[in-house]
Amino acid sequence: MKRTRWTALLGAGAMVLGAGVAQAQVETLMPPLVAGAAKARVEALKVHSKDIEGNLLGTPAERDVFVVLPPSYERERKRRYPVVYALHGYSIGADQWMKEIRLPQTAEGAFAKGTPEMILVLPSSKNVYNGAFYSNSVTTGDFENFIAGELIDYIDAHYRTLARPASRGLVGHSMGGYGASRIGIRRAERYGALYLMAPCCQSPVGSRGLTAEQVTQLEALTSTEAASTLPFLLRGTLALASAWSPNPLRPPLYLDLPVDSSGKDRPEILAKWAANAPLAFLDQYVSKVRKYRAIALDVGDKDGLVEDTRRMHEALRAQGIASSLEVYPGDHTSHLAFRMQDYVLPFFGSSLSFSK
């Protein structure tokens, strides 16, 4: 069956339209164990966010966060560590993201191969629409502010971190890649290095053929919980609309769709969506983004996001911002764990500051 542009943009990674996203994503290949790798420790936290309090979807302000502490953390009590924040994709939470990238095994393997030890932090942004797109919205809550503000402050207060931008990294895959590009561009002063893994939604996504019948189906929903029965692509439409075109005057969904009930595009809503595309707002933050110590992008050659990823790389270079791009053999999810162990963590190991 044909893979649609929507599926690629939302970062499903599904090879068949309608296939379960989580099912597709756990097919990530497993790297072999690295001989002699010391054990890391994983802590599961609940971090309260004032930025997410009071959102109209009722998404809990207590957010699941996983922290991977390096092998030496308990032993070297005076040592401080850089921190890398890793953002998950659409339809999954941080727990499934951990499984996809095979943490803590891939971190242990990277450290055993010579990557300097660091702390990894994986927050969850999953909600009733399967993802908040790491944006600020009265409907979803202010996830951008939470990730770039409250979460950093919490981790720096509770762990032995090197609490400065030069020792802080941001990475994400798919929707998380969108989040990393969005936050990494808009809040560049908070981070020292940025890595985008097959980032979705770098270009304006448009209405993508949303029909009058589909709009009628969505507008007939009587609760946000009813969205759980929707097909994948329609649920993804609600996720985007709740993040990018929230409307507190339109219960129960509290959003505006980019197409009206007659099937016509709504230019004022599409303009809001386009304004949230990193390729649309990059130019406004060039002076901040230029200060990164390093920026890298990667994507599989069989991934529908190849061209969008390439466009972001080219846009950075056009502004005189150094970045690297690797298009590797693979699809949207096939090599995530290998990439994390052998490329992503070594990238941060060589680009972040490890000195006090």
Segments (PLM) and residue ranges:
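Bacterial N-terminal signal peptides that target proteins for export
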Residues: 1-10
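N-terminal targeting/docking segments
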Residues: 2-3, 20-22
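Bacterial N-terminal signal peptides
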Residues: 10-18
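Non-catalytic cap/lid and distal C-terminal segments of serine-dependent acyl enzymes
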Residues: 23-356
